[in-house]
């Protein structure tokens, strides 16, 4: 049996929330896609969307029978990170804990490398 290192963690809390959000949809192929774009106050920002397509080179991580998809360009900035879901006084949201970010903005949605 080989020991394959997964480059990104998809937490149980995030998987549970994705599962609850897609249960009402009429598309069992939906997955959460996390991606990085230029912008935000720190240079890069995280984006989340639901997608039923897996493109060539995409990484798919399964947890609780739901998938997280990351394109190769975004993955290089996310290696070693964690995609989580939090609920608190400031609201609920998907968050990325990224060890590659040298700084993040106050809201946590943008970062710099």
Curated annotation (Swiss-Prot):
InterPro entries membership: FeS_biogenesis, FeS_cluster_insertion, FeS_cluster_insertion_CS, FeS_cluster_insertion_RrpA, HesB-like_dom_sf
Cofactor(s) needed for function: iron-sulfur cluster
Keywords: Iron, Iron-sulfur, Metal-binding
GO cellular component: cytosol
Intrachain S-S bonds: none
One protein family per Pfam: Fe-S_biosyn
Transmembrane region(s): none
Coiled coil: none
Functional summary from the UniProt entry: Required for insertion of 4Fe-4S clusters for at least IspG.
Name of this protein: Iron-sulfur cluster insertion protein ErpA
């Amino acid at each position: 049996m080989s020991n394959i290192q997964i480059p990104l963690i998809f937490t149980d809390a995030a998987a549970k929330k994705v599962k609850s959000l897609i249960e009402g949809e009429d598309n069992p192929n939906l997955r959460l896609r996390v991606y990085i774009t230029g912008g935000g106050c720190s240079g890069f920002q995280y984006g989340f969307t639901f997608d039923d397509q897996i493109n060539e080179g995409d990484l798919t991580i399964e947890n609780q029978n739901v998938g997280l998809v990351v394109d190769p360009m975004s993955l290089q900035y996310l290696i070693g990170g964690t995609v989580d879901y939090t609920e608190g006084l400031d609201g609920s949201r998907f968050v990325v804990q990224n060890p590659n970010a040298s700084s993040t903005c106050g809201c946590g949605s943008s970062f710099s490398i």
